[in-house]
Every structure is written in structure tokens, then in C-alpha cells.
Swiss-Prot record:
Domain (Fibronectin type-III) ranges: 468-578, 586-681
Originating organism: Drosophila virilis
Function: Mediates response to the active Hedgehog (Hh) protein signal in embryos, functioning upstream or at the level of patched (ptc).
PROSITE patterns (alphabetical): FN3 (PS50853), IG_LIKE (PS50835)
Protein name: Interference hedgehog
């Protein structure tokens, strides 16, 4: 085997090793210490949810729903107040047109629902905004009818009070049932009192501070429904008598029939007044204290009044028991215990989080909320209540358990907390990885099936299984482009060579267009990074789309057997025109850290942490600054991420980076370009090669190798060093071989042979390759000619003995030094001129010393030279003839050869 072939085989053996080493280098690697982040939401939220309303019959109520980004379309759901428990149903546009009580209008990111207040329209309403396959639901708005009615217990109730001057009189007018809460009007001697002269609350209590003789008279009240304007006059009356003369001293006490509120409810942020009723003479003074609310009485938010304690900007920590002491120096003092309950709207403290979940697995979603009264928690799965899902169970603490996650659960999962004061919601994006069915058991959606013959070997069936990628997640990049993200789970199926992206436009008429395939081949080994649990993510963009159109996308995987299989189809995606979209926050690249020779760490920030609610993640773009090629892309999930490591870079190279935030329906503008450099290679002496044990275990093709960058560089450098050593050895061996084949005493013979091409002829025994040898004619001294004749005679005798056995021989050519003989080169000659020269030599040898000759053929010894050297060749008539072909590329150095300069022609 020649040296060249050995070297080629060596390279072939080394190439797979180098390829495997290079493939083991991770392309993208997550940050070593990432900050904990919640699962990404859909990137959209309800900015303005419909509000609960109380209206009189026949009025028109408008519910308004506004989203942060324009959805694909709006829907409204309704649950009648007559159904227990309430069951929501969607209000279709067709039914809304037929029903004159309901009208639905949409305008970009705002939807309005107009409802005529009637008994059949009372209930709860929700707004549902659809963003492709995601349904984001608003909080519930209640529609109630205004009403007011009196309490029969207070009928014909009259009070007669005699009070000393200077006291504060608190009179409770009566109790009414009103929705909404009524406003109160008081009358003194049947004349309405101005509001500024009275102090009252929503419970119908009249406060008359520092009464005097002028305060004596008859008092009554009227309750008015603020929504309908209906007035209700209560029959209760107060006959108050304030003597002008002084009365006897009395201890503080309650008047006959006077009420004391021992429990007060107030909302956080409002101003509350705790009343301390009681009269005496002299008028008593109130002293306040609280055993379980330290510092609540004497602070900048409280004010002690003669008739009560006023607390402004109420906070939950103000809740507790308050004690009022009425004392005028006469024992016993009057004591009241009042419990203050601070009500608060619900607020979710711990929203649910969800990651990629395999179909059939068990999942628990947690949701913790606060509020007063204690909020009730319920769940919606893509707008549908979890109560009607057989796989869902809500435990007493409010958490939701999905015993077996199904594909229908994929989408937006929302947790709602509500009480009498309001409602609050939070959600998360739930992604479901469907089960991989064996070949032949699909649902008919996969068109790329393997054409291999079925086999009974289970092992072989697993090896030929083609595991498809996941359905792509779609994000808007511009008016004409989207970004697709998909993943491949670790498996034992066939290796994937590359991906193709397919998309299809959906028309309003429902007519489907054919699938379009992009031109780009997305290699399996490019643009990937690990997201944990053996999942490899991929990213690609699709351009040339039409705005305000709906599309579906899917990923086609091409495997090592040149067969293909497609992923599940994405949900319907509506490509919204950018002018109608609210801009997302643009991340700011703060620093690019030189992490290693092949990796850098990006650090960025947002202008406000509140922008995280609209963001699902970030796209990182990078390329060498000296290149104008396409940017490489990386996907960073999680709005709370603030750093990310990008590896597999060139050592000591400057790169340019830019970031872009994205949500489910849009992407932000690019951040400003920022350059960063990887660490330069460290200058060190060449270490001695160290042999390491090689693990021959072949990993799965979908398995990621997380190698240290220093180890990766060492392996690559060692491989290059081995290649350099082999190349040097090859060059040295080839040089020695060339020296052995070209002796120094025949420097021009090879050049002469290159100028002639032999013609193969058929031998009686076997085909032979004919060689032509042309030797220079001796034109030098007689001594040199005689020495040459002796050498030729010896060669002739040796080869003549071999001729009888071989049937063919090739005479060793006689070589003369052309420079010594004075030749400058060879002249171009045809085969006929060669034969004439040969015959001339023969006649010269036969004629002895006849004639003068320039070639010294008349010298003694010429005849013997011709007979001994040339005649055996000329007389070998039984040998096949030689035909000499002249090459068209005869070099110029042979153009000086004359017809008389040839000594012999070997045939």
C-alpha cells in the first residue's frame, strides 16, 4: 500500500473523531446561576375589565373590555342569575343580533357589550380575548337591578328624648334594604335639613353635636336609591327636647332605644367614624384605647372627636377592638367595645406557574390569595371552568390538581379570587407535550411515514422510530414576519438531519390554501440550547407574510433515513398590523462579560419591572463584528431573566450583540448594538501530549454534551497537532521517495521520456507496455566512446540470456552528460527521421573508415561499436515493433536535437 493511500485512510479514521468532538461543543448554554423566574405568560393582559353595575329596569348598561394588545377576536360569556350554580355560556354574534337586549361591538383592542336591564339579562358577564389558541378571560362583572324597600320592624317607631344642653345626640333613623346603598335626607319639623348641617352615614344615623334649646323639635328621615332615584320615607320619628335650664348631674348613659354599633365594617383606604353614643350632665368626654391595635389611636391618621374616633386612609393593620370610655366625673363611666373590620379586595399573592408538561402526567397548580372577607378561588382553563373538567380537582386550599394532563389543557390557565368587594386574577401559559404514538397508530395528521418494511424485532422498531418535533410557538416580529420556537425531547429514535418550516394561510371563507415550505434547511446541530430535562430548543423566522391575516405553522423533520415527519400544527395565529399594537419594552444591554475563550455572558435590564407582565422572554442576536452575515439567534424564556450565557464562540473575537423582548403576539424593537470580546488564548509552552481514556459509549443523537470550554479547546488543539505531525511525515516520505526514483546521473532522461507516449500493442503472450529510450549520440573523444561500447556489450550479454525465457527485454539506455558533450538540447524528430539516422549509423559501421564524418564514425572501433551494441536490437525481427508517438507538448529544451545526434533507438 502506497504512502498516499495510508495517509488517506488515516484521515478518514480521524475525521469521525474530530466531527464527534466538534459536535460535542454546546452551541448555547444557560446561565450558570440564573435568577428564579416564573413561567412565561402570554404577554397580554386585560387593561380594563367590565365593572359590576346596578341599574334600574329598562336602562342600557355598557360593559367595556380593553386589552394591552389587539386580540384576534373578542367573545362575551354570560351566566344568568337564575341558575345556581351559575353556568357561563358564550354570547354568539348571531344570537346577539336577534336579541334586541344585547349588542356587541369591537374596535381594535376594545370591545363593548350593551345590555338592556331586564330580569332575563341579570347575571354575570365576562370578556374573553383570543390570541391564537390562548384565551385570556376578564374578571366577572355583575349586572343587578336597582331596588329599595323598608324594614317593617321600624314601623311606627317613635322616640322621645330629653337631653341636657351640650350633649351630642346620635339617632338611628331606621333600616332599609337598598341596592345600591341609599343616601339619607333628614327633616326638622318637616323641613329638609341642609347636608352641611348634619352628620350622617349610610346606615341612617343622624348626629346632632352640641345640642341646645334651639335643637328641640321633631325629626324624620327619607332614604333614596342612588341608582333609580326612588325615595322611601321611613315612619320613624324623634321628638327631641333640650331644656334651657340646667339639669341635675347624671352619669353617662344611653338614651331610651338608642343603638350602639359594636361591629363596624369599612374598606381599606376609606375614612371610618367610630361612634361613642351616650349623654350625661355635665356632658361626658370620650377616651379611646385599643388592646390589640398598638399605636392606632394616637397617630397622624386618627382624630378624637367629642362623639367618636375618626380614622382616615384605613389600613388592614387598623382592624381590631377599640374601647370608648365616656366619663364626666360621675361614676360609673360608660364603656363601649367596638370591633373594626377592615375589608379588602382580593389580591393573588402567589400566582400559578406551569412549565412544559408531558401528556398524561400529574400536575398541581398553586394559587394563594389574600382579602377580607376571605376570597373564594376558582380556575379557568382557556376560558372554561375547571369544575366541568373530569381530570381537574380543586382542593380545599384552592390549589388545582390535573390528574392526567391532556392536550385540551394546553393554553392559558387562570386563577381567580373574589369576594364581596371585587375580583382578581392571574394566569400562566401551560404547554403540553403530546404522547408520541408508534408508527402506524397516528391520528392521520402525520404525512411523513417511514417506508421501511415492518419487522418483528422490537429493538429495530425503536431504532427506526421517527419522533416528530413539538408544535411551534408563534411570535410576531413585524408586519410580514413571525418567529417560530419548537423543541425536540430526548429520545432513542432516528437522528434528525434538518428541519423545514411549512405554513398555510387561512381565508375568511374557510377555504384552505396549500402548505408553503420555506427554502431554508435548519440543521439539527445549529441554533439549539438546553432548557432542562433533555429538551432541545430551536428557533427560526418566517418572512413574506401578509398582515391582518391568519396562519397556521408546522415543522417538518428530515431524518437520517431521508424520510420525514411533521409536527402537530400550531394554533391559528393572526398576524396583526404593527400600527395597532402597543409597543413592548425594549431591553437595554448593560454589559457583556468575557466568560471564557469561547463564551460570553449578556447582562441587561428593563426600564421598569412592571414591563415584565407584558413580556414572555427575550431573543438574543449575535455575529462577529467583522462579518456582515446573518445573525445567530438564541431564545431566553422568562421575563425575569437578566443574564444569559452564549457559548461556542471563537477565541479572542469581537462580536456584536442585540436583544429583543417578545410576547405571544408581538416583539419589541431591537436594543442598541453592543460589542463584546471573548477571552484571548493564553500564551503558554506546548505541553506534552497526554493520553486519556476514550469513552467509546455512543450517546443518543438527541443528547446534549455540556463540556467545559477549556476541555473543548484542549481536545481541538490536540487534534490539530496530530494532523500537523501526520502532514509533516507525509511530506518527508514523499521527498525521500522522489529522491530515490530520480538518480543524479540521469537528470534529463525523465524529461525526455515525458515528451513521448508509448503505444500499447498486443503481445502473443500478454499485453505489454512499450517503453521508448532515446540516448544521446556521443560526439566527444574516442576514449569515452570505447568505454561506452564496453558497458553496452556487458549489458547486451546479460539481457540476451534472459531473452529466451522472458521473450522480451528492455535495454538499459546509455546516458551521456549533455553538458560535457556540448549539447544544448534535443531537436524534435519524427519516427521516420529516427529510422534514417539508425540506417546511417549502420552503413557507417559497415563501411569502416569511408568518408569524413562529423560524428567520428570513421574512427577505429566504430564498427565494433555498431555491431556489438546495435545489431542485436536491429536483428531481433521476431520482436513486436515499436511505434513512437510524439506528444504535442514537447518541451522547448528538446528542439535542438538533430537527426545525426542519435546513437541508437531502443525497440
Amino acid at each position: 500500500m502506497s504512502l498516499t493511500r495510508r495517509f488517506s485512510l488515516t484521515l478518514l479514521l480521524l475525521l469521525p473523531l474530530l466531527t464527534s468532538l466538534l459536535a460535542a461543543i454546546p452551541v448555547l448554554q444557560a446561565n450558570l446561576s440564573p435568577a428564579p423566574s416564573s413561567s412565561p405568560g402570554p404577554g397580554v393582559r386585560i387593561l380594563r375589565a367590565p365593572e359590576s353595575t346596578v341599574a334600574p329596569p329598562g336602562d342600557e348598561v355598557v360593559f367595556v373590555c380593553e386589552t394591552s394588545l389587539p386580540p384576534e377576536y373578542f367573545e362575551w360569556s354570560y351566566a344568568s342569575s337564575r341558575s345556581h350554580p351559575p353556568r357561563f355560556k358564550y354570547l354568539k354574534s348571531s344570537s346577539a343580533k336577534a336579541n334586541h337586549n344585547i349588542t356587541i361591538t369591537h374596535n381594535n383592542d376594545i370591545s363593548k357589550l350593551r345590555v338592556i336591564v331586564r330580569p332575563e339579562t341579570l347575571g354575570e358577564y365576562r370578556c374573553v380575548a383570543w390570541f391564537g389558541p390562548l384565551a385570556v378571560t376578564s374578571t366577572t362583572a355583575r349586572l343587578e337591578m336597582a331596588s329599595i324597600s323598608g324594614d317593617g320592624a321600624d314601623t311606627d317607631q317613635r322616640a322621645h328624648w330629653r337631653v341636657a344642653a351640650g350633649n351630642t345626640v346620635l339617632w338611628h333613623c331606621g333600616q332599609v334594604a337598598s341596592n345600591p346603598a341609599p343616601s339619607w335626607s333628614f327633616y326638622y319639623n318637616d323641613n329638609e335639613m341642609p347636608p352641611a348641617s348634619t352628620l350622617s352615614d349610610s346606615n341612617g344615623t343622624l348626629l346632632l353635636p352640641h345640642v341646645s334649646a334651639a335643637s328641640s323639635g321633631s325629626y324624620s328621615c327619607v332614604a333614596t336609591n342612588t341608582a333609580s332615584g326612588v325615595r322611601l320615607a321611613l315612619p320613624s320619628r324623634l321628638e327631641l327636647q333640650v331644656p334651657a335650664a340646667a339639669l341635675a348631674s347624671t352619669a353617662p348613659a344611653l338614651l331610651n332605644g338608642q343603638r350602639v354599633r359594636t361591629q363596624v365594617f369599612a374598606k381599606a383606604g376609606e375614612t371610618v367614624l367610630l361612634l361613642c353614643p351616650g349623654v350625661g350632665y355635665p356632658p361626658p368626654t370620650a377616651v379611646w384605647s385599643s388592646p390589640n391595635v398598638p399605636g392606632a389611636v394616637y397617630n397622624n391618621r386618627t382624630r378624637v372627636l367629642p362623639y367618636g374616633l375618626q380614622i382616615s386612609a384605613l389600613q388592614p393593620l387598623d382592624a381590631g377592638t377599640y374601647i370608648c370610655y365616656l366619663d364626666n366625673g360621675i361614676r360609673p363611666a360608660l364603656e363601649h367595645f367596638i370591633e373594626l373590620v377592615v375589608q379588602k379586595s382580593p389580591r393573588i399573592l402567589r400566582p400559578p406557574t406551569a412549565n412544559l408538561t408531558n401528556e398524561g402526567e400529574r400536575m398541581q397548580l398553586e394559587c394563594e390569595a389574600t382579602g377580607m372577607p376571605k376570597p373564594e378561588i376558582y380556575w379557568l382553563l382557556n376560558g372554561e371552568s375547571s369544575v366541568y373538567d373530569v381530570e381537574a380537582e380543586q382542593v380545599p386550599n384552592g390549589h388545582l390538581i390535573l390528574h392526567s394532563v391532556q392536550k385540551r389543557h394546553a393554553g392559558y390557565v387562570q386563577c381567580f379570587a373574589r369576594n364581596s368587594l371585587g375580583e382578581h386574577s392571574a394566569g400562566t401559559l401551560l404547554q403540553v407535550n403530546p404522547k408520541q404514538l408508534p408508527d402506524g397508530e397516528g391520528t392521520g395528521m402525520d404525512s411523513g411515514r417511514s417506508s421501511a418494511r415492518p419487522t418483528h424485532s422490537r429493538k429495530q422498531k425503536q431504532q427506526t422510530q421517527m419522533v416528530p418535533p413539538s408544535a411551534p410557538n408563534v411570535t410576531r416580529l413585524s408586519d410580514e414576519s413571525v418567529m417560530l420556537r419548537w423543541h425536540v425531547v430526548r429520545n432513542d429514535g432516528l437522528p434528525i438531519q434538518f428541519f423545514k418550516v411549512q405554513y398555510r394561510m387561512l381565508t375568511e371563507s374557510g377555504k384552505r390554501k396549500s402548505w408553503q415550505t420555506t427554502n431554508e434547511n435548519i440543521p439539527y446541530g445549529r441554533q439549539r440550547h438546553e432548557s432542562g430535562a433533555g429538551v432541545r430548543n430551536f428557533t427560526s423566522s418566517v418572512t413574506g407574510l401578509k398582515p391582518n391575516s391568519s396562519y397556521r405553522f408546522r415543522i417538518m423533520a428530515v431524518y437520517s433515513n431521508n424520510d420525514n415527519k411533521e409536527s402537530n400544527t400550531s394554533g391559528k395565529f393572526f398576524l396583526q398590523r404593527g400600527a395597532a399594537l402597543a409597543p413592548l419594552a425594549v431591553p437595554e444591554l448593560v454589559d457583556i462579560e468575557e466568560y471564557s475563550q469561547t463564551a460570553v455572558v449578556l447582562h441587561w435590564r428593563l426600564s421598569s419591572d412592571a414591563d415584565e407582565q407584558l413580556i414572555s422572554g427575550y431573543y438574543a442576536y449575535y455575529r462577529p463584528s467583522a462579518s456582515a452575515g446573518e445573525y445567530l439567534k438564541a431564545t431566553i424564556d422568562g421575563a425575569k431573566s437578566r443574564s444569559f450565557q452564549i457559548s461556542a464562540l471563537e477565541p479572542g473575537t469581537i462580536y456584536e450583540f442585540k436583544l429583543q423582548s417578545f410576547s405571544a403576539v408581538a416583539a419589541s424593537e431591537f436594543s442598541a448594538l453592543k460589542q463584546g470580546r471573548t477571552q484571548r488564548p493564553r500564551a503558554s509552552s506546548t505541553p506534552q501530549p497526554v493520553l486519556h481514556a476514550v469513552d467509546t459509549t455512543t450517546p443518543s443523537h438527541n443528547e446534549t454534551f455540556n463540556m467545559n470550554p477549556m476541555l473543548t479547546g484542549t481536545i481541538g488543539g490536540g487534534a490539530l497537532l496530530v494532523l500537523l505531525v501526520i502532514s509533516a511525515c507525509l511530506c518527508l516520505c514523499r521527498r525521500r521517495s522522489s529522491r530515490g526514483n530520480n538518480p543524479q546521473h540521469k537528470p534529463r532522461l525523465a524529461e525526455l521520456r515525458e515528451d513521448f507516449v508509448p503505444l500499447n500493442t498486443c503481445s502473443p503472450n500478454k499485453p505489454r507496455t512499450r517503453h521508448i529510450h532515446i540516448t544521446l549520440n556521443p560526439l566527444a573523444q574516442q576514449q569515452q566512446q570505447q568505454q561506452q561500447q564496453q558497458l553496452q556489450q556487458q549489458q547486451h550479454d546479460e539481457k540476451e540470456a534472459q531473452d529466451n525465457d522472458m521473450g522480451y527485454f528492455q535495454r538499459q539506455p546509455v546516458v551521456y552528460d549533455a553538458e560535457t558533450l556540448g549539447f544544448n538540447g534535443l531537436a524534435r524528430m519524427s519516427s521516420s527521421s529516427l529510422r534514417r539516422s539508425q540506417r546511417t549509423l549502420e552503413r557507417a559501421a559497415a563501411g569502416g573508415g569511408s568518408g569524413g564524418n562529423n560524428n567520428n564514425l570513421n574512427q577505429p572501433g566504430d564498427g565494433s561499436l555498431a555491431n556489438s551494441a546495435d545489431s542485436p536490437r536491429l536483428q531481433a525481427s521476431n520482436k513486436p515493433g515499436r511505434v513512437i508517438l510524439k506528444r504535442a507538448r514537447l518541451s522547448s529544451r528538446s528542439e535542438n536535437l538533430s537527426s545525426g545526434s542519435l546513437n541508437s533507438v531502443g525497440v
